[in-house]
Amino acid sequence: MNNSAGHYRAGRAVAVVALFAGATIWGLIWYPYRAIEAAGISGALASALTYAVALLLGLIVFRGKLRGARIDGWLVAIALSSAGCNLGYVLGMLHGEVMRVLLLFYLAPLWTVLLARLILAEPLTRAGAALVGLSLTGALVMLWRPELGAPWPTAPGEWIGLAAGFLFALANVLIRRAHHYSIELKSMAVFVGVVVVGLGYVALAEPLAVPQAGADIWLLVVVVGVVLLAINLVVQYGLMRIAAGRAIVILLSELVVAALAAWWLAGETMGLREWLGGALIVAASLVSAKIET
């Protein structure tokens, strides 16, 4: 009995560490992408290349669980929405202030409530209405510009972060709708989606040229790809063993890591409006956790 309880506590402790590790990595992942872009590899191409590394490794790791997998419209929709989310997350971080982009991305619970109502026919509860109100108020506080007279994002990176959060919510709702897929298959769909969409964007919107990056940058591309696969597995492990309410609180530590990293590595700081708006958006995420629980 004692041994079973001990193993249970140990397993939960490992799961908590796994989620903290995931939040830490996602709070720092923008920095190597900025280094890669500074070396001459665009954000879109860097995303496609790093996710291609994750995809190749994933096909090796998951090969036994992917045999006989069936692909349908739901899986394609998950792949495309996840691709837009992940690509937008990286591009937003590259072209905007880290914390403003990340907080706009964290409006995802707002979109989740609305999309779940539209796609899954879930009722809008009082908690859901509170989430919508907190999210919108936080965004209004953070984005309000007296000189413009409107609470709109003012930089391309902010618009991209907002769109990435919407696509993240859409992907989550689609995954809940198509719950018959395995975690491994959904992970591979995400990786394939980012590679295809990223390369498509590069082909259509960027000049065709071979990047003249050094060996150290190409090694960094490979390392980031390995980390992307590893963190996907680590976070999935934690989410399967920790209640949703506690998991979201742990994952919100990404904001703390990102704020410290942006200040230390990029010299970016937040003003009073950003702190107040961010607090409301975080509160909305905590309400979202209560709804999920």
Task: Give short role names for the model-derived ranges.
Residues W144-R145, I248, L252-T293:
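C-terminal-most transmembrane helix of multi-pass membrane proteins
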Residues L102-L107, I175-G193, L229-W264:
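Helix-helix packing/entry segments at the starts of transmembrane helices
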